[in-house]
Amino acid sequence: TYMQMLRVVMPQVAGVRRAGAAALDLAYVAAGRVDGYWELGLLPWDTAAGALLVTEAGGHLSTVHGGEYQHGGDICAGTPRIHSAMVAAFAPLVAARPVGVKSAGTLRTAGDKANA
């Protein structure tokens, strides 16, 4: 669940934010405003534009399990440095996650200069 994922990342990051739209959160990753983003239970139109922005900016995309992102369902996006750490941190949780649970969050690391 979101709270379990949040408990895993909070001790390791400067903050977690949620803009409210997957496309905007992904655009923030692409622009470098946030370092990472995850969400469960998305539809293809939620992420099509944002996923392209992340890819073109040199970011990494996958499912939260680390598999190839398929434009819907779960997504994990981030800078190359953060992405693999997010997938590894979430691995024990997503393996036990019930189907259909929705969760979201964006990550800011301690080095993030964006305003709170």
Region locations from a protein language model:
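An extended, acidic
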Residues: T1-A116
